[in-house]
Amino acid sequence: MFSKIIQSYAKGNLIIQICAGIALGILIGINSKEISEIANLLGILFTSALKAIAPMLVFILILTSICTKDFSQSGVKIKNIIILYIVGTFLASACAILANFFFPVKLVLDGIQATTNPSPAHMGEIFKDLLFKIVDNPINALSSGNYLGILTWAIAGGAALKHCSNEAKQVFIDINEGVLKIVKFVVKLAPFGIFGLVANSVAQTGAQGLLSYTKLLILLVATMLFVTFVINALIVFFYTRKNPFPLIFICLRHSAFFAFFTRSSAANIPVNMALCAKLGIDKEFYGISIPLGATINMAGAAVTIAILSLTAANTVGIEISLLQAFLLSIIATFAASGASGVAGGSLLLIPLACSLFNIDYDIAMKVVAIGFIIGVIQDSVETALNSSTDVLFTAICSKNELNYNIK
């Protein structure tokens, strides 16, 4: 009987389960502060599990990605689309930073006061702090959650192992798969953790806490829509000198719609390939560009990482300099490309960006937990942007005469 319940839960729809957890958490938070305090243990366990797995996830994900990817077969078109993917992701992160400067959001977090570890004020201090974090001992970086150190050693390790044997690379691929399975297991427990977090948040902060979550969600979705209809439109126009919107709306109807519900760029690859075929793009090209885009084209993830990191900074009272904002754009671009194929991957990489501002690791993980609460909508919109942009950029780089008469 018990095993059947577990199997039924494991096969259930995560979105519905999270919604149920949110609704039940609000109900308990309003009616019983005592039960909310007990339920908060589930939230603490969930955030602790995320804190434990996140450093290892970032390290093995980036190391494996660098040492196993092979672009030796890349022709001019593939090189162009790689550049376009990176530029698009960078511009998306830059837009997210500007959006946060114009419409800053502060979260109501229980027990969080103004930071006692402020961000460095001068350029020299910033670079000194960055350098010491970068050259940190790799074991210490993993154990302390120093994501800049983790990132450095992952890149160095991936580059050093680039030319190792296929058998050795397979070992890292298998380890990567193992870590991803653990992450998927932890994420599958999100409804219980979110139930506890929401119950405690409502009991402690009332409607004000939920209102701050709503403002954050609106900012995220609005920024992603801006990237879709303004940034992507400008990229298409400058690349083709043609009206971008017919192609954009085709990509939204035939790619974004499905990606919104699957919440997975990888799962949407067959849909995107079928759309490319209907558009009249060469199979040899989209056969490489679409899977590649599902791996490195992560504009939506960059928006999520940048906005939630800056929201964490706003919450603890850190003022961000222009240099730090520029560095965040670069980090968000790189980190977003490592978020592919991971449920909630962009959320788990937020501590990496937060480390740029000396934000306490516990606070960063509380923001990650809030990301899971609003992720029911945020992750769907993020995936829709990521996946539809794969087709959009593939189409303009293909140089084929496109078929716009698609039903």
UniProtKB/Swiss-Prot annotation:
NCBIfam families in the cross-refs: PRK13628.1
Residues spanning the signal sequence: none
InterPro entries cross-referenced by the UniProt entry: Na-dicarboxylate_symporter, Na:dicarbo_symporter_sf, Ser_Thr_transp_SstT
Pfam families referenced in this protein's UniProt entry, alphabetically: SDF (PF00375)
Keyword rRNA-binding: no
Source organism per UniProt: Campylobacter jejuni subsp. doylei (strain ATCC BAA-1458 / RM4099 / 269.97)
Any one Gene Ontology molecular-function term assigned to this protein's record: neutral L-amino acid:sodium symporter activity
Assigned protein family: Belongs to the dicarboxylate/amino acid:cation symporter (DAACS) (TC 2.A.23) family.
Keyword Transcription belongs to the record: no
Reactions performed catalytically: L-serine(in) + Na(+)(in) = L-serine(out) + Na(+)(out); L-threonine(in) + Na(+)(in) = L-threonine(out) + Na(+)(out)
Name of the protein: Serine/threonine transporter SstT
Superkingdom per UniProt: Bacteria
Annotated GO biological process: serine transport; threonine transport
Keywords (A to Z) from UniProt: Amino-acid transport, Cell inner membrane, Cell membrane, Membrane, Symport, Transmembrane, Transmembrane helix, Transport
Mode of membrane association: Multi-pass membrane protein
Single GO cellular component term: plasma membrane
Cellular localisation: Cell inner membrane
Membrane-traversing stretches: 10-30, 42-62, 81-101, 141-161, 179-199, 218-238, 245-267, 288-308, 316-336
Protein task: Involved in the import of serine and threonine into the cell, with the concomitant import of sodium (symport system).
Gene3D superfamilies in UniProt: Sodium:dicarboxylate symporter
